[in-house]
Amino acid sequence: MPSVIVIGGGIGGLTAAHELAERGFSVDVYDSRTAWGGKARSQPVAGSGTNGRRDLPGEHGFRFYPRFYTHVIDTMNRIPTPTGRVIDRLRETSESAIALVDEATWFRFARRRLAKPYEVVDALNLFFRELEFDPADVALFTAKFLQFFTSSDARRHGEYEHISWWKFLEGDLYSPNFQRQLRAVPRTMVAMDPAVGSANTLGSISMQLILDYAGTGVTNDRTMGGPTTEMWFDPWIAHLESLGVRLHGGTPVASLETADRAITGVTLRDGTRVHADYYVLAVPLDVVPTMITPAMGAIDPALERLRTANIDSLVSWMVGIQYFLYEDVRLVRGHLFYPDAPWGLTSISQPQFWDDLGLFRRRYGSGEVGGLISVDIAEWSLPGTYVTKAAKDCTPEEIAHEVWQQMKAALNTEHGRADDVLRDELLHSWHLDDDLDYSRGLPPTNTNRLLVHPPGAWSMRPEAGTAIDNLVLASDYVRTFTNLATMEGANEAGRRAANAILERCHAPTPKVPVWPLQEPEMFDVWKRLDDRLYRAGKKHVFELLGIRAAAQAGDLLRRFFAVTGIDKIDDLLDDTLAGELVDRVITRLARRPSE
């Protein structure tokens, strides 16, 4: 079988290597770091472990595995460990919570199973009622959210891709309090400003995350039962080596050579030249323009768009900090959101999920640390409350102080120290993401920024296969079903890169499976109806009927069920019948029901 060089040892590159090696290819992987896993790797705090204990586990940001992660989970299911498979090391989170400043309690929310489309309205109304938002805000938001649920894929890609999530939601019409939450939630979840992220991407992922709470079971919103490298990447690397993959850590690639519409070789930074039949470029978006030469761009317009792209306009920061505590503070059994925190914080208390590893203080550090709260910081351009500078303009010490104070403001009560959840004397030490480089002063350099999918970004993003005969791409900016810069998106991109090679060499092996995002069947009929409307140049049925509130949306869904007697269309329903159904239903639903 042919030989392959993979440039980049993150999830995209390792996935491509895994799939190709399983199919008999000769694979070499090169990465500038000695640690594998890219942004997802663990970052041990050097020198913190004593007397045989491991170093304290830092990270770029905590990892979570929601229900819609399919590709990553499939890969984990195929990586052996001494006692089973990597998938067995995932742990269910049973709840999440929102901590607001000046509130005596946190708002915990558990999952609720939804069976009918209009039950989404009831669930969202219940959730927002607990947070005491203005009913008018809740009514409009729920109606707009349900409009997205019931929009066809064609409308999402053709219309919503080109507007922001803020514009789709009509964000300017909400109260200042609700607007603050609308801005906070996408930032904390996926590091996106709703005024910048496309409605197609943010709507799709928001829908998946909402649906994650519309079901129960161990496949919902999971976390790893230990540090990511220890639990996942170490066994993955061992498995890749058992498949014959040769891994070259700490070996940066300097350049690619091109001739006759093909890559002819790779030059390493030490001057060594290496060759293969096929090449997988799996480096981050910040790095890929430096690897694409003008000659490569002349062959493939998609590569040229990447080479000349204004990367700063496409990316944002989401960076993690970990607080090591003398005692464990469990908070909630899941993720905790801080909508009032100006720096867009989300956290998880991790040792409660690591019980199988034994007592935390016996395994990590000096024996003094018993707790770990891992925090993601999603907003780096707004001033803090206590330091009053943007995070980018702060020293690491100032960042650690500000984030700690923002968490205390949300978690502690007004009743005084006896009731405080976080106390300064609990804090042993902290670790800030190693990928922030302060060597040149402030602001730091961040080489692991996230693609934020602004409106129209899909047209800039390349397919996995390029116009260069033996070059494919495997990173989270590649076009995928996932359509989000995540571990899932990177894994799917790696699979698509492997498939592109399989097609080009006419390999007699099975293709690597890729799967679209799954949506509940209860919305099928609505999406089919909207597809007809969109292709006829008409607006969504909610807009045609002037529906602007959740109660109206719920009433429409209930009346549709009463008119048609169905809540999904059989797969055998042809386009003619669907078209007739559109006209009939719109005509009847437009009439006011008799009293």
Where are these predicted regions, by residue range?
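C-terminal auxiliary extensions adjacent to catalytic cores
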Residues: 543-595
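Dinucleotide-binding Rossmann-like beta1-alpha1 core, especially the glycine-rich loop
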Residues: 50-141
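C-terminal segments that line or cap access tunnels to active or ligand-binding sites in enzymes
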Residues: 214-222, 276-278, 283, 287-461, ...
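Conserved beta-strand-loop-beta-strand element in the redox core of flavoprotein oxidoreductases
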Residues: 256-274
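Active-site/ligand-binding neighborhood in enzyme catalytic cores
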Residues: 141-259
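N-terminal Rossmann-like FAD-binding beta1-loop-alpha1 element of flavoenzymes
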Residues: 2-29
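Active-site-proximal substrate-binding core of FAD-dependent oxidoreductases
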Residues: 500-555
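Glycine-rich FAD pyrophosphate-binding loop
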Residues: 21-48
